[in-house]
């Protein structure tokens, strides 16, 4: 199904009424229910969680909504229910929603030509393919551009990114070839901003976020002040579930339409072929910034396992955040473990399994670093500041300030002229703050001695998918720090090494 015309005036007036009425609604919260009351066994959910912990490295949160009620929810500490998590490309589905709302308000159509929105950024001699590119082609990632031409798009550059996009080669007729295209999502955001006078995040405020009870989120923007569109949104797990429930209900929310059902149908249908494999959930077709899945489901997803999965046949929504390199593995677990357990009617009460599930969900924890509380090297390392050779992370020095009998260790890492303090202990997480890439963010640390000369420090950036492991090897006056990250856009493994030497005793603590 496609949408080619502006909706009539009545629909536009309806959208305006929705915006005006958003502030009058009571704050929304999902009702909670037992799994059995909604047709799924607690034992099956427990089996899914156990399998995920063994097979996926690692889920950060999980929420299952059935018949409009939350039947299971859990966060692996230090990740928490009230903390936002970066969405990566799951942001695209929200950008698509902004386009749908703008279409409903008569501000554009999916058949509008892209060049028409940006007359001042059109190349001197635009190709026929560029001239033919429509909003629909941006939505379906069928712009006609080659992958190598959109790689390394400079999202945070000073230059005009709209002009940059329009200058890229368009080798194929738009609408004929699927190529995953995050710059196209940026262009959708730019178009929404052009026709509404608001960034996507501000435009969605009264139209989506407020009615769904989503606190005003952070959405990263380009230096031109345009929400990045294809990534950069930060929201909570329950916010993902609410968004999925809106789509499951075909745009209805608390008995009122927020999003036209025709848009929901078009956005989540197969608009573009993206492969022919019957076993890949990345080749079942693509809608308007939504993926089709096997078994007739659909989803929005983001790098390293951020998921909003809608199961219309089962009246269910699954929201997941994670930090994994095995995104297909997460979906396969859901298909294999959860889908067969979704029954059409309520099940008999199973108090024993229900209690075990509740206990499991309340005690979830990301594996903390194990280790000994002390070692042979600890005595000589404590209290010394090691000056580091120049490195890409701008880390200048590291010091093990203290360590107690239980192994609780205090570290100071000096980065870009500022001291950052961490406390870590074996088998537990200790929260702190670190400045990473110039931005302060909350983290949690754990650590212990994993060899006589080695202290292993694990730092979870618990609003992101990322966990960084620092292995500090002490030898005399020298320390070598190997750093690894659980997930990233490059191959796994060590991504940097710092080498440092202890300052003379007289200068310890002088900085």
Placement of each model-derived feature along the sequence:
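A small/polar active-site loop signature that marks catalytic segments
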Residues: 145-221
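Active-site-proximal alpha-helical segments within enzyme catalytic domains
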Residues: 141, 184-191, 231-252, 306-323, ...
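Peripheral terminal and inter-domain segments
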Residues: 22, 348-511
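A short, well-structured edge-of-sheet supersecondary motif
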Residues: 49-80, 315-318
């Amino acid at each position: 199904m496609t949408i080619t015309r502006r909706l009539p005036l009545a629909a536009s007036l309806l959208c305006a009424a929705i915006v005006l009425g958003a502030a009058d609604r009571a704050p929304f919260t999902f009702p909670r229910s037992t799994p059995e009351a909604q047709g799924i066994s607690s034992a099956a959910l427990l089996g899914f969680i156990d399998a995920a912990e063994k097979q996926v490295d690692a889920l950060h949160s999980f929420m299952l909504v059935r018949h409009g009620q939350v039947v299971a929810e859990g966060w692996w500490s230090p990740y928490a229910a009230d903390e936002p998590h970066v969405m990566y490309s799951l942001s695209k589905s929200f950008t698509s929603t902004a386009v749908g709302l703008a279409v409903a308000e008569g501000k554009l159509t999916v058949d509008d030509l892209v060049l028409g929105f940006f007359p001042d950024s059109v190349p001197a001699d635009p190709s026929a393919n560029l001239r033919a590119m429509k909003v629909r082609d941006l939505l379906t990632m069928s712009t006609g551009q080659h992958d190598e031409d959109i790689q390394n798009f400079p999202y945070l550059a000073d230059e005009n990114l709209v002009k940059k996009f329009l200058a890229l080669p368009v080798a194929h007729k738009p609408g004929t070839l699927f190529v995953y295209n995050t710059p196209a999502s940026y262009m959708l955001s730019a178009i929404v901003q052009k026709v509404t006078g608001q960034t996507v995040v501000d435009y969605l405020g009264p139209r989506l976020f407020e009615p769904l009870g989503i606190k005003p989120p952070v959405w990263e923007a380009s230096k031109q002040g345009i929400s990045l569109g294809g990534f950069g949104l930060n929201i909570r797990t329950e916010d993902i579930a609410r968004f999925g429930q809106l789509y499951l209900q075909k745009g209805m929310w608390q008995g009122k339409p927020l999003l036209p059902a025709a848009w929901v149908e078009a956005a989540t249908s197969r608009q573009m072929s993206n492969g022919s494999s019957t076993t890949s959930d990345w080749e079942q077709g693509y809608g308007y910034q939504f993926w089709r899945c096997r078994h007739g489901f659909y989803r929005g997803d983001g790098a390293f396992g951020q998921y909003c999965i809608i199961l219309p046949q089962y009246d269910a929504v699954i929201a997941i955040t994670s930090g994994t390199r095995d995104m297909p593995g997460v979906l396969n677990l859901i298909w294999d473990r959860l889908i067969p357990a979704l029954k059409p009617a309520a099940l008999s009460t199973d108090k024993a399994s229900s209690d075990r599930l509740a206990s499991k969900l309340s005690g979830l924890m990301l594996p903390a670093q194990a280790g000994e509380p002390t070692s042979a090297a600890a005595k000589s390392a404590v209290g010394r500041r090691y000056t580091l050779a120049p490195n890409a992370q701008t880390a200048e020095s590291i010091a093990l300030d203290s360590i107690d009998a239980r192994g609780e260790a205090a570290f100071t890492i000096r980065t870009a002229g500022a001291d950052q303090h961490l406390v870590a202990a074996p088998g537990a997480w200790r929260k702190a703050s670190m400045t990473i890439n110039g931005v302060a963010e909350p983290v949690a640390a754990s650590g212990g001695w994993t060899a006589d000369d080695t202290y292993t420090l694990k730092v979870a950036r618990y609003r992101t998918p990322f966990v960084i492991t620092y292995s500090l090897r002490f030898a005399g006056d020298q320390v070598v720090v190997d750093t690894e990250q659980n997930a990233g856009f490059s191959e796994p493994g060590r991504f940097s090494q710092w080498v440092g030497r202890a300052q003379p005793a007289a200068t310890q603590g002088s900085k």
